[in-house]
Swiss-Prot record:
Cross-referenced Gene3D superfamilies: CBS-domain
This protein's name: SNF1-related protein kinase regulatory subunit gamma-1-like
Taxonomic path: Eukaryota, Viridiplantae, Streptophyta, Embryophyta, Tracheophyta
CC annotations in GO: mitochondrion
Originating organism: Arabidopsis thaliana (Mouse-ear cress)
Gene: CBSCBS2
Oligomer status and interactors: Subunit of a probable heterotrimeric complex consisting of an alpha catalytic (KIN10 or KIN11) subunit, and a beta (KINB) and a gamma (KING or SNF4) non-catalytic regulatory subunits.
Modification N-acetylalanine occurs at: A2
């Protein structure tokens, strides 16, 4: 127990250190006059978060922790949202957010769980000769998983006979043989396997709680309606939160949900104000943008597998990648975690995910973009573009990042994210969160 706590404490310290390093780089490079930065901080500190526009529909969609994955997918899809707060069923009536909410579930968490489940199931199917031959499907259950030494959500639930049988019917047994390798087995998983993931046991009964434990991207930290926009902007920039729930003291439900994108849209609406016009007219280079060098930007080649793109995003905790070609890394597209909706909603695409290249996936998305609200082309700017033009691109195109392209061949020079833009407008006063929100950075990142 002490060992796990030590590891957790080390991870928290590492996260804090990463946040500090990022923000120190931002502050040292953006070169805003101290008086202007203090004026901006004072202005944002005077704006209550309660004045921020409500989410569409005026109600934050929440999902119960015991909700099956299939139902969670439907809720997110029907509500046209990418994420939702998760209510701890054991403490649903609690007025303390620390007890009531477990975190935030999003499409990225679900798809990564689905992909891992598919991989593990394929290994189990290919490693058992009886199943590969299409007989004795029940032999591969929790026992088979344990024998193979698997870990993760699937190991916890076990591969029940019904799931294995349905998967076999979906295509694996059609290629009868002994000792098939796992990749081949996975390649043969057809539409029926997609249905297994969401409609058969044990996947059908897998809950949001289970996924949240395995694929948690960021801490859950709400602010009160009395908090300031400075608090929200610091959480969304320095501390890398993608969204900040808003609660009212003494009431259980989340009142609003402020995202990085919504804040940048709000900044876009500040045109005409002296402070905004001054900063937005500056070339991005004057603000130290992009904050990462070309070699630091994580990218994906167009001929690499889409599965590798999603894994790369997961491993680096980022929401998107530029698609590049050639030694000079010419920017030819963009893949983001938002695009995974298409993978979830199109079983014929999912069934071939192990063989699908980024380029092929982009082509399929391009033909369905209008229906699913997806955009595969990369939004770019030049090294001499103004911050205002970047903000306009982010807001008007509803994207999370703009790539900086250089030269005649649109070579990858850098990336500017929503987080980067917000960071340009704020700095953190000493001991700000301890003084204003009543908790330490360590507690925040431990949520």
């Amino acid at each position: 127990m002490a060992g796990s706590e030590a590891v957790e404490d080390k991870e928290i310290k590492s996260a804090v250190s990463s946040c500090e390093a990022y923000f120190e780089k931002v502050q040292s490079r953006k070169n805003l006059p101290k008086s202007l930065q203090e004026t901006l901080n004072s202005a944002f500190a005077g704006i209550p978060v309660s004045s921020f526009p409500q989410v569409p529909g005026g109600r934050v969609i929440e999902i119960q922790a015991e909700t099956p994955v299939s139902e969670a997918v439907k809720i997110l899809s029907d509500s046209k949202i990418l994420s939702a707060p998760v209510i701890n069923t054991d403490h649903e009536s609690s007025l303390d957010w620390r007890e009531r909410y477990l975190g935030i579930i999003d499409y990225s968490s679900i798809i990564l769980w689905v992909l891992e489940s598919a991989e593990l199931a394929a290994i189990a199917l290919s490693a058992t000769s009886a199943t590969a031959a299409g007989v004795g499907a029940g032999a591969v259950g929790a026992l088979g998983v344990a024998a193979l030494g698997m870990t993760g959500p699937v190991a916890a639930a076990g591969l029940a006979a019904a799931a294995v049988g349905a998967a076999v019917a979906g295509g694996v047994a059609a290629e009868r043989g002994i000792g098939k390798d796992a990749p081949t087995a996975a390649d043969k998983l057809g539409k029926d396997f997609y249905e297994v993931i969401l409609q058969e046991e044990p996947f059908k009964s897998t809950t949001v709680r289970t996924i949240l434990k395995s694929f948690r991207w960021a801490p859950f930290l709400p602010v009160s309606t009395e908090s300031s926009m400075l608090s929200v902007m610091l959480l969304l920039s320095k501390y890398r939160l993608r969204n900040v729930p808003v609660i009212k003291t003494g009431e259980p439900d989340i009142k609003n949900y402020v995202t990085q994108s919504a804040v940048v849209h709000g900044l876009e609406g500040c045109k005409g104000r002296d402070w905004f016009d001054h900063i937005s007219a500056l070339p991005i280079s004057d603000l130290g943008l992009p904050f990462m060098s070309p070699n630091e930007v994580i990218s994906i080649e167009s001929e690499e597998l889409i599965l590798e793109a999603f894994k790369r995003m997961r491993d680096n905790n980022i929401g998107g990648l530029p698609v590049v070609e050639g030694l000079n890394k010419k920017i030819v597209g963009n893949i983001s975690m938002r695009d995974i909706r298409y993978l979830l909603l199109q079983p014929e695409v999912f069934s071939n995910f192990r063989q699908l290249t980024v380029k092929s996936f982009a082509t399929k998305i391009a033909t369905a973009g209008e229906e699913y609200g997806l955009a595969i082309p990369a939004i770019t700017c030049r090294p001499d573009s103004t911050l205002g033009s970047v903000i306009n691109s982010l807001a008007s195109r509803s994207v999370h990042r703009v790539y900086v392209a250089a030269g005649d061949e649109n070579e990858l020079y850098g990336v500017i994210t929503l987080r980067d833009v917000i960071s340009c407008f704020v700095s953190e006063p000493p001991n700000y969160f301890e003084n204003c929100l009543g908790f330490s950075v360590k507690e925040m990142l431990n949520r």
